[in-house]
Amino acid sequence: MREEIWTEKIFKDDAGYFLRITKPKSRIPLNMRKTVAVLGDASADPDSFKYKLAFETGKMLVDRGYRVQSGGMGGIMEAVCAGAHASKSYREGDTIGILPSFDRTKANEYVDILIPTGLDIIRNGMTGCADAVIAIGGGAGTLMEMAAA
């Protein structure tokens, strides 16, 4: 059986012309959860306001049915993943870490899906894979990631 990949609507407009609107059907399941990338200061201290804000952001996002994506390392990246794990709605796979190196040991303990790219700062463009982006603090690197998104 062939999968239908196009939907069509044919109708008459006010002038009597037949119009055909054709568009591809989405191949993304309707139940697929959206991903939000959270960017920020890699050296944020666990006692800082930014770290606590990132923790609460990760928790809130997972509570509302989103996955979180980060650089997978320390600071804000760790906080958002830890917050996601603290959510009552947390499921395995809710945290995605896109590492700039191939060294898996650099990832924080809260990353479920680890993607070691080996792309260094070029991996910043991977934020474009997310459905939305949130920045919490940071500097030039965070700004570069935001611009790439």
Give the role of each language-model region.
Residues 21-88, 92-93:
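Glycine-rich beta-alpha loop segments
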Residues 55, 62, 74-148:
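Acidic/glycine-enriched connector segments
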